[in-house]
């Protein structure tokens, strides 16, 4: 959770009001080749998306993932993301908390087969 405070900071401060917010957070940016947004060099994973549509009445937006970048330091010997190395966190909107990700609780595309019979 090395960058928790820095990520929170750049999310709550407007670049229109604080021009050096990345520098203040200790981040360095690289221009994306896929979307009109910066990539934060210090973060291990970037999921780059383009907006497909947005409904202002419900605040629901749909996006399309156009690129995923992963730092080699968080890959395992098979080239897959090692979640323990990446140490991702998620935002809990119900409680305004950040939570650590990582405990395996099941097998995707497999556990549900028990109900098919």
Model-derived features: where do they sit?
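Basic, polyanion-binding surface patches
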Residues: 1-117
